[in-house]
Amino acid sequence: MDPKRSQKETVLITGGGGYFGFRLGCALNQKGVHVILFDISSPAETIPEGIKFIQGDICHLSDIEKAFQDADITCVFHIASYGMSGREQLNRNLIEEVNIGGTDNILQACQRRRVPRLVYTSTFNVIFGGQVIRNGDESLPYLPLHLHPDHYSRTKSIAEKKVLEANGTPLDRGDGVLRTCALRPAGIYGPGEQRHLPRIVSYIEKGLFKFVYGDPRSLVEFVHVDNLVQAHILASEALRADKGHIASGQPYFISDGRPVNNFEFFRPLVEGLGYTFPSTRLPLTLVYCFAFLTEMVHFILGRLYNFQPFLTRTEVYKTGVTHYFSLEKAKKELGYKAQPFDLQEAVEWFKAHGHGRSSGSRDSECFIWDGLLVFLLIIAVLIWLPSSVILSL
């Protein structure tokens, strides 16, 4: 943002207590923008001077309206969502309340409070549902809702459509119109990331990372948190009149622009923490069957014990099936330029927080986890193999 203009900017970030929302807020604050973080949970890090945090539930319109009070908000970054991975993917009711109901509330509040710009954080998953996509672009149609393998992706697709369809909505009192756009990021990584990397490191430390799966030539994408911050700031600018409202009503794919095999991407993390990268490779369909089995077990037992599934079906697709997208539209219309990053920062972060292999540690726990993993894999194999093969054994 232009420093001279940014002095008059006030932005509200839903999901501002999370990893990415907080990083975005800090970056905007450094540019002189007045930042309001809105989230149900407070940030894990110390809130810098000049940033205001308001605790509230996006599912409650009254909470959102309180956050809008006493502030002439010029842009909302709607990042808050629920159900991205793990056991959260299986809580359909809360996923729908947050991702669809929360988005409806934000759109209503923007209209009432005469907010001129809204940037929505979407996902690759509105297009991808397990099919191979190579260098796809924004002209691709939405994946039909009934084909989504999880409710998170389905609700994010519905919410993105609502946001883009709201572009041009008249604001209250005839004070202009609402300009909206949506960014579709790849999987986020960076030092201190709180969702994906800690789960992966936990599996590594428990001895559960015993195999990889799928075609070794499969390619996926990731986006460093700082590249995603850059994209959101550029998108907010591209909704302004001095940029010709070029981003109005538009979706954009955002990534580092470097397709890579999922497991090779994480090799530096595994080896950097002192562990051995697995050499065993399993068929994708077998692992998908295993994921389906764990989801069924969670469905049956989840109310008694809400355990973390080892993998969900969507996670198998996301990590084992080729899908990557062109950045040309984001480059041309937003001026997006992905900077080069790797996992070294994350490795150092985990080491600084006490992670990394120490000889002889956790052996008994790893043995228990190994046994459980082998047991579930045997069941998955029995389900996966054709019945004629099983009967002949």
Swiss-Prot record:
Alphabetized InterPro entries for the sequence: 3Beta_OHSteriod_DH/Estase (IPR002225), Lipid_A_modif_metabolic_enz (IPR050177), NAD(P)-bd_dom_sf (IPR036291)
Residue positions binding NAD(+): 156
Membrane topology: Multi-pass membrane protein
Alphabetized Gene3D superfamilies for the sequence: NAD(P)-binding Rossmann-like Domain
Keyword Chloroplast found: no
Any Gene Ontology CC annotation: membrane
GO-annotated molecular function: oxidoreductase activity, acting on the CH-OH group of donors, NAD or NADP as acceptor
Any one of the GO BP annotations: steroid biosynthetic process
Active site: 152 (proton acceptor)
Keyword field contains NADP: no
Cellular compartments annotated: Membrane
Pfam families (UniProt xref): 3Beta_HSD (PF01073)
Record's keyword terms, sorted: Membrane, NAD, Oxidoreductase, Transmembrane, Transmembrane helix
Broad EC category: oxidoreductase
PANTHER family: BIFUNCTIONAL POLYMYXIN RESISTANCE PROTEIN ARNA (PTHR43245), SHORT CHAIN DEHYDROGENASE_REDUCTASE FAMILY 42E, MEMBER 2 (PTHR43245:SF51)
Similarity-based family: Belongs to the 3-beta-HSD family.
Name of this chain's protein: Short-chain dehydrogenase/reductase family 42E member 1
Name of the encoding gene: SDR42E1
